[in-house]
């Protein structure tokens, strides 16, 4: 586990004041009309860089009035901005069977958020800014994206209520709460600020032989939480068209939700071999999806047993695809292949990702995925060595409008 030595102080640059000055709950919240030109397709190969991003939009109109927990239900057109996400099923392509689809969320439905900030008071490796990160993020979600306070669970180790402490049991319970009863076009949000690390991977599913883990406040007694478990609880149960946005402010968070597609400002860093997964029987085609039958949606992958030798005893484990028909994306500030030395440096950057995300979104709430990735990179570069990564459960058209 890499200890973060100290939290950089944000000084006046952190938009703390701006939170309270905002009268308007939905500044520039809108979906632009479709682009007049066809989307550029520069993403088929890992080697390719991104196409030039479109010009920034001229800003949407302002919003007044709000419904609790739902975003505004009308969107003013913004001319020349990125295209809103398509509403119909999208094919995975790249070797996946015909009919193996995913669906973007319009983020017009219910909104729930889980935010976890751990300073590890009185423990070796105590951190300074994690609870503050969560306060800033929850305020931003509440004021700008219509997440009602009563639809947020906030676990921090400065709270008196034992149920609000970020213990392993409370975190796992809250993860189940977050995804329970989610429907298409809902927008779920997960934020973790605290220690992250790596542990040897037992089921052979990580490229580098390590699983990424997060450390609950009681990890010395209860242990850590592995990326496989977070994926199983928060990604696996989601139907097509449900958005889960995750932001990790921690070391080694590059693949903390075990999402198979990873993008950087340079282009696609990683994508799954879907032809191989299909050959192993991992990609069950969801015919019920084509019929619009949401009930048959839950099992998206046929389990496939794989032998692995551990010492002398051979044991069986289930290998499953990490793709999902849901709309799961994650912003993180570290790479899977970071050496521990890099991680020591990045370790001082706890809070970097959420700070850069909020700062970039405040400057322009109407960006495409690739524009936002570049904006976040620009914000990070003013204070930190880390670079942002955007991971997804499905192939992303990064020229689409980022909605939440």
Swiss-Prot record:
The active site is at 195, 251. Keywords: Apoptosis, Hydrolase, Protease, Thiol protease, Zymogen. GO terms for molecular function: cysteine-type endopeptidase activity. GO terms for cellular component: cytoplasm. It is an enzyme of class 3 (hydrolase). GO terms for biological process: apoptotic process; proteolysis. Residues 1-97 are annotated as: Disordered. It holds the Pfam family Peptidase_C14. PANTHER family: METACASPASE-1 (PTHR48104:SF30), METACASPASE-4 (PTHR48104). Involved in cell death (apoptosis). This is Metacaspase-1. It comes from Emericella nidulans (strain FGSC A4 / ATCC 38163 / CBS 112.46 / NRRL 194 / M139). The gene is casA.
